[in-house]
Amino acid sequence: MCSAGGIRRPIQIEEFKTAISGMSDMELAQIKTEIENSINHLQRSNARLGKYIAKLEGADDRLEADDSDDLENIDSGDLALYKDSVRENEIVLNNYNERVDALEQETVYRKTGHGKSKHEVEAKDNTNKGPDVDMDNSNVDVVTPNSIFI
């Protein structure tokens, strides 16, 4: 069985769409659950980091009971690290959301059975692009085959 945890390298969204098209419905559901769990963890992490940032910037003096100890032990030198972490987490969240959308599109496509999945349509559109050029070489002058006549 395949899982998001088994991926050894970052995978681009197009590769992800291709990979999920060959998976079972159960695998799609499992991967979606794993991604949604990761999204929840990142959102909680960003909320906590947001509190740290607000505390360091002096914008938030309100402390919740469970956060007061953690917020008292933060160092002002950590501000840049916290901001970078939030920014990186947002990028990962966007990537995860793209994957959830792709999983939902694949599921809808499988349930409706109508037409082609969005990924298949996009892939076909990319292969059909290009200039319409006459590739027929039957009119080539044998004496000067590499010449261009204007």
UniProtKB/Swiss-Prot annotation:
Q: Is-annotated flag, keyword Isomerase? A: no
Grouped into one coarse class, the protein's main location is cytoplasm
What does the entry list under GO cellular component? cytoplasm; fatty acid synthase complex; nucleus
- Gene deletion effect: Decreases cell fitness. Causes severe growth defects and an overload of polyubiquitinated conjugates when associated with a RPT6 thermosensitive proteasome mutant.
Per its record, what triggers expression of this gene product? Expression is increased in absence of RPN14 and upon treatment with tunicamycin, an agent which causes accumulation of misfolded proteins in the endoplasmic reticulum.
What ranges does the record list as Basic and acidic residues composition bias? 118-127
Q: Where is this region: Disordered?
A: 110-139
The protein's location, in the record's own words, is: Cytoplasm; Nucleus
InterPro entries per the record? TMA17
Write out the function statement from the record.
ATPase-dedicated chaperone that assists the formation of the RPT6-RPT3 ATPase pair, an early step in proteasome assembly. Plays a key role in maintaining homeostatic proteasome levels and adjusting proteasome assembly when demands increase, such as during proteasome stresses. Function overlaps with RPN14.
What is this protein's name? Answer: Translation machinery-associated protein 17
> Which gene carries the instructions for this protein?
TMA17
